[in-house]
Amino acid sequence: MNYPYIPHTDEDVRAMLDFIGVSSIEELFSSIPVSARSSLNLPESRDEFGVFKRLKEISEMNTSLEDHAVFLGAGVYKRYVPMVVYDLAMKPDFLTAYTPYQAEVSQGTLQALFEYQTMVCELTGMEVANASMYDGATALAEAALMSFRLTGKEKVVVARSVHPEYRAVLRTYLEKRGFTVVEAGYDETGRVLLEEVDEETAAIAVQYPNFFGVIEDLDYVRSRSGNALLIVVVEPVSLALLEPPGSYGADIVVGEGQSLGLPMWFGGYSLGIFATREKYVRQMPGRLIGQTVDQAGNTAYTMILQTREQHIRRARATSNICSNHAHAALIAAVYMSVMGPDGLREVARRSYSAAHYLQERLEEMGFKLRFSGEFFNEFVFNVPEDYPERWKWMMAKKILGPLPLKGFYPELGDTALACATEVTSKEDIEKLLEAMK
């Protein structure tokens, strides 16, 4: 055989052809008209070294953010991940996206997910968290569905300052099922204006900090919610500095966990965070890992409350998670464990400081803040009319500039959303400022 990685010998092929009653490969494909046949036009075969070299050439056509100054956030953030995180998380013992149904052979994964749930509860100030959702947007949509089950109502009010793509996913999930989605506006501070809440509202959904980077006043939101449930979309790193949503009476907390050790890969690797109050646990979607004791008296971990799930009760399931993002949750658990409370707080503090330094320097150049509300590590500022073209030009200069917002918020006119994190250096900022002149 010319190709040792193909397992079939000439004798194997001959035996299979004899079994189906044809004399050759050509006869096997004779039913395909000649007019429909064409050459595969494949390049000449290469050895392993040649293949590796060619793949390296192709990969070098890609753009790597490692050599870019990055000021683009909007839900996905460039952060530093200690090498030990992936050294541990990529061990073959852990490397699967599948649910650990068989507890007796999955104790390591189950314990890691239990620790992840515990740390999410500590960050959010909630009582129970699940072992992952697909991403922040679908977690918000599932939170709205959960609020409908809990209240028997069919309307959700979502702040227009929530990520526009999250709101789009929310509508995709809800409107074709007959549920109502109403958007609440925002004021000059960038915070939500709640005028649409009534007795028919199942839940209010706000983002904290919101898409504009502004820190919402959750006391105000809670005071205007009436009997509606409060859903808060969070950026988890910010909670190392900000008061957790649970302290303000949040009923459900969701968010995107990419900041917790996951890379900025195109289209994913995402992680949906989902936490709630214990009294609502039976209506919560997603896997739940619990701690117990086995027959020998040893600590053991297992999936719990599985009667909520589709593999037990398909018709009445509150959870329809199949192949899931448990491995992403495991990475987040390792990252949070490695960083610890002090390390995560330092990441948040540096992100806050870098963003405020960037804003001050831009203001010195005449770029004014659009909103007056306090912000975390992102902010909206006014830009010239030709900024979208300049944005593309900056990308060619290895600067991933602040996001133009006119396509998302036409009413804001010529504005952009800038982001800084703990990896944003003063040299990066000077490079951006020079490009903005």
UniProtKB/Swiss-Prot annotation:
The Enzyme Commission number assigned here is: 1.4.4.2
Keyword field: Oxidoreductase
Name of the top EC class for this enzyme: oxidoreductase
CDD domains, per the entry: GDC-P (cd00613)
Biological process, per Gene Ontology: glycine decarboxylation via glycine cleavage system; nucleoside metabolic process
Give the domain of life.
Answer: Bacteria
The GO terms this record gives for MF are: glycine dehydrogenase (decarboxylating) activity
Q: Which reaction does it catalyse?
A: N(6)-[(R)-lipoyl]-L-lysyl-[glycine-cleavage complex H protein] + glycine + H(+) = N(6)-[(R)-S(8)-aminomethyldihydrolipoyl]-L-lysyl-[glycine-cleavage complex H protein] + CO2
The UniProt family comment states: Belongs to the GcvP family. N-terminal subunit subfamily.
According to UniProt, the name of this protein is Probable glycine dehydrogenase (decarboxylating) subunit 1
- Originating organism: Thermotoga sp. (strain RQ2)
| Organism taxonomic ancestry | Bacteria, Thermotogati, Thermotogota, Thermotogae, Thermotogales
